[in-house]
């Protein structure tokens, strides 16, 4: 039996995304709210069942059935999804060895495969693009290049190669890119790539785009070799550059074909290269994109003048600089700015710098300030926050700041305008951050705060078991009262969402029950029935529902004595109903019900049976029904048992119809604890209470409880009561009413196998 009432926050005037002002936000809502494509659903099923569908080679790797054939686009998407899900391994990569799939665009980003698996699976295909960024150390960059060069077709036709890895042996020097003569786009970001390698690469005949960010290059003069064909140059955080400013600018000045230049840097380095570049009038005449984020001494005036002299410019990166707040950057048509001066600039920065943790941190810091009093739902921004968290799982500052931004973007009703799938992703990323940083308290607080959001806690899919473990651990930390209240509140709701089996598996359950009882005892001693007290009672009630383990912990920690003290201290019906609800849960556990057959407990229950408050009387009656149904508990108290049964019968006779309303919302996980009561014809009072209770919930929520009657085979018991000669007319009447309601609910879904009864 459970009681589920959770007061929500009073929402502010929330404004949904405006299609004209926030087209991207509307697109995100539509995308996230749309069902997955049929292709993706099929691919997910295929990936989940690879072991069943594939045969095994002698070397232990998998092989698809010979007669299967994948269109190229589907094969490439299949590989992307496998990689995204972390399912691409040496064992599974082998499915790309056969003739069932032909690949041209290969993405193995962050994959954990060996050199041998990579060469066998992918280097036989006619690849034109390969994204091997952030692959595991088992696949070093020299081996990737060597594998690609083993295929003559790839040597001549591979157009795009993206690398990002520090996994190069220390004694490795030259990387032999020169054989890949078809390369147009090359990224060696974060690779042990030297000046000699740059000289090698600069001679590639078709090279147009080059990213040498965070490499070991000390001199970029070799770029003059490809000055007539290089259109895009990215050299973010080129920390080893040993040239003077004038020497660097002299090289850049010669790159007449350059359309895109990125010389952004870490703010802490205080590089003034961008400052000097902005002063040049005879440089980059055709540039359309300039990134100088992180540069020192950058002013609005200098950037504005530079752009006015190059009217074709479409993008400028100004994050972590002193520039970007001028009206020029908002009024210039067609100009996109990645910066921190406005939401649009921050959005552009989060999108463009998603793989650069230094700038993700900066953008998130600005975003937190901008969204502190946010009253407009911004799903596109929340999605960018999620991308930042996903791309930098081990960066504490990214995770912490992102968690704070996520709170700002979803609190006080804003979550209602967010797609459930997006909220689910963010919540799962928060829990991933908790696992990566288990001792960072502020991150834990942010996660707990997010769980207090009723939209997230009730509607959003995430691992409730992990969440319960986290919240219960937090509960036992004796934090400040406000955080304690939140932890108790979340526990009370999560307890409803766990199966009894999951609750029993919680290692933290014993300590949580003990801590909750300590709170109840303290509040009772202080005569303080505040919100924390009420949430704590509810949490204990819900934790013990259907959980013998939790009930046992309750008894072992003097829970009965504490709850008797509660009943003697407080007379409010809201408190009484919660106490009696929990005692109902204990009464349902046969091994523990004897603990309730004491003078103290029975005195209070019998007194509350006559309460004017319907729910209080109802719960007291339930305890009496369960206790008196077991005659073994009353061997020396038979007179008392008969008296209780008489009082129970008289009380039920005075109750209104079973369809009446109660202040508390009564729900059940199962009817199975009622079945022994339904078959107890020797004690009609017990049977009558069970029927009244079942009819009450069936009338309130027929879709749930009529289905439960079928699944748990309770219909036959009701039919038996209708036909049994010892059943009282009142019991037969209620049983008939339940069956009538059942017929009405399922009249369009009649199935004779559900129950041997006439429809």
Swiss-Prot record:
The keyword Repeat applies. Probably acts as a target recruitment subunit in an E3 ubiquitin ligase complex ZYGA-CUL2-elongin BC. This is Protein zyg-11 homolog A. The lineage of its organism: Eukaryota, Metazoa, Chordata, Craniata, Vertebrata. Gene3D superfamilies: Leucine-rich Repeat Variant, Ribonuclease Inhibitor. It holds the Pfam family ZER1-like_2nd. Belongs to the zyg-11 family. SUPFAM superfamilies: ARM repeat, RNI-like. InterPro entries: ARM-like, ARM-type_fold, LRR_dom_sf, ZER1-like_C, Zyg-11_UBL_adapter. Transmembrane segments: none annotated. One of its GO terms (cellular component) is Cul2-RING ubiquitin ligase complex. The keyword Repeat applies. It comes from Homo sapiens. Keywords: Leucine-rich repeat, Repeat, Ubl conjugation pathway. LRR repeats lie at residues 204-227, 235-260, 490-513. It comes from the Eukaryota. PANTHER family: PROTEIN ZYG-11 HOMOLOG A, PTHR12904.
